[in-house]
Amino acid sequence: MNKLLLVAAGGAVGSVARYLVGVGAMRVMGPGWPYGTFTVNVVGGFLMGCLASWLAHRGNTSSETWRVMLGVGVLGGFTTFSSFSLETALMIQKRAYGQAFTYSAASVLLAIAALFAGLLVARKVFA
């Protein structure tokens, strides 16, 4: 039960943060591209890399608590691959194939690259 509360609390924080990034991106960049979703997927990948490295460095029993709250809860609520999938499908339905390909390829590749960058940064910081 305690883990469920950690996931719920973390998920609430992550979801609110995701919403605020989306609102901010829409205000700054406009509706022409899903900038908010793109941003949270890349930033979320980087933060997950940092978290994974930090937890591996800690290596104690409290690491599971942090993993559940931050990794599953906060970052699970923050990153939005379900929204990403919907937005890509909508682009395809509109026959915007080039935009759909560019958006999906850039999101996946940059999120993975950002995760590796997060691992490298955190290894240097926590080593």
From Swiss-Prot:
Molecular function (Gene Ontology), one example: metal ion binding
Keyword Transmembrane found: yes
Residue ranges crossing the lipid bilayer per the database entry: 4-24, 36-56, 72-92, 101-121
Catalytic activity entry: fluoride(in) = fluoride(out)
Family: Belongs to the fluoride channel Fluc/FEX (TC 1.A.43) family.
Activity regulation remarks: Na(+) is not transported, but it plays an essential structural role and its presence is essential for fluoride channel function.
Keywords noted in UniProt: Cell inner membrane, Cell membrane, Ion channel, Ion transport, Membrane, Metal-binding, Sodium, Transmembrane, Transmembrane helix, Transport
Gene Ontology, cellular component aspect: plasma membrane
Protein name: Fluoride-specific ion channel FluC
Binding site for Na(+): G76, T79
Localization: Cell inner membrane
